[in-house]
Amino acid sequence: IIVILVIIGIIFGINQIIKSKNDNVQKLAKVYEDLKSSQSYCFQMERNNNNKIIMAQKGDKTIIDQYTKEEEANTQNHTTTLIKDNNTYLILHDRKEYYVYEENNVDQTILINGIKDIINKEFTRGNEKVRGKRYDYEEYSGSSMFMISNTLNIDENEVKTRFYFDKNDNLAYIKTIYGDDNELLKISLTKDVDDAMFEIPSDYAEN
């Protein structure tokens, strides 16, 4: 019986050490390392059905897809910045037209480098209920990168960003907090990227 109790005690102690080690892991840093080592990813930030941003990369091709609609507006705006073949394309979907900027590459590492800058800042940990479920979060100060709303008049030093993770450490939500206001984005991150995302529709005209 004593031997069994000792074994149980050892197992419990090992589990506590592992749990403590996992609790101290910087989860956003793991997201960064995963993105940096991947050849493709699709990162979607959604405030609601009418306002979202999709950033995708596959090899040397990148898109930034933006959907916006103001509350008083009747239509949704959809624009895409596409970088491929050493050119940048600005696609205006409502007009079915696009502009070509030859040999003018937009920074294709904006997402990865943005997260890299954030993980080097001080952060705190917590747990909070979001839309009915509880999530662990890491809160960082000094970045408005993940705000879809207008950020022109915002003092970044006053901004806090919470990254919420599910039980499998997948990024689930991002909340940007500024004073009494906040913006919550639902996050989807996958490595499955369809090549069709990087194609301009055949019925669009070059301007």
Each predicted region: which residue ranges?
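N-terminal leader/targeting segments and the immediate start of mature chains
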Residues: 1-61, 191-207
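Compositionally biased amphipathic helical and low-complexity segments enriched in hydrophobic
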Residues: 6, 36, 83, 91-93, ...
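Glycine-rich loops and low-complexity Gly/Arg-rich segments
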Residues: 10, 14, 66-68, 114-117, ...
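Flexible, processing/modification-adjacent segments and terminal tails
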Residues: 19-27, 34, 83-155, 196-200
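Short, exposed beta-strand/loop patches in secreted or surface proteins that constitute
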Residues: 32-36, 52-58, 80-82, 121-129, ...
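Residues that act as N-cap/strand-start positions at coil-to-secondary-structure junctions
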Residues: 37, 48-49, 74-75, 122, ...
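An acidic-aromatic
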Residues: 51-114, 170-184
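Gly/Pro-enriched, hydrophobic low-complexity segments
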Residues: 67-79, 131-205
